[in-house]
Amino acid sequence: MARTLVVKATAGIDAPERCSQAFTVAATAAAAGVPVSLWLTGESAWFALPGRAATFDLPHAAPLPDLLEAVLAAGKVTLCTQCAARRGIGADDVIPGVRVAGAATFVAEATADTAQALVY
């Protein structure tokens, strides 16, 4: 069984390189056929909203909407429940395919025998 790559993005426009790294690694793994679970936490939670990824710009980086689309197509994208609540984001507000789940789900995914977790 292939290992699942669990990527936790904690940064958004406040730390663009770290944000881009998380999305790039997740999308690259998905493109390589690795099972991927991308978690949007902290300031990256905003990218669960339609159109928000398009507002992100980092020179010499792949467009965030393309990276997010790649992960959505081949893996899972999860918005942190508490992060969403702190930002007034509801489950009906997010991009289709994004689920909302909390710490217990993250811990279960990240500690599975077949998982490798990365936090950016």
How should these model regions be labeled?
Residues 4, 35-37, 76:
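Residues at the starts of beta-strands that form the adenosine-phosphate
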Residues 6-20, 51-52:
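Short, glycine-rich nucleotide/cofactor-binding loops
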Residues 19-32:
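Histidine-anchored nucleotide/phosphate-binding helix
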Residues 44-58:
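N-terminal beta-loop-helix "entrance" segment that forms/cooperates
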Residues 118-120:
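Aromatic- and Gly/Pro-rich donor/ligand-binding loops
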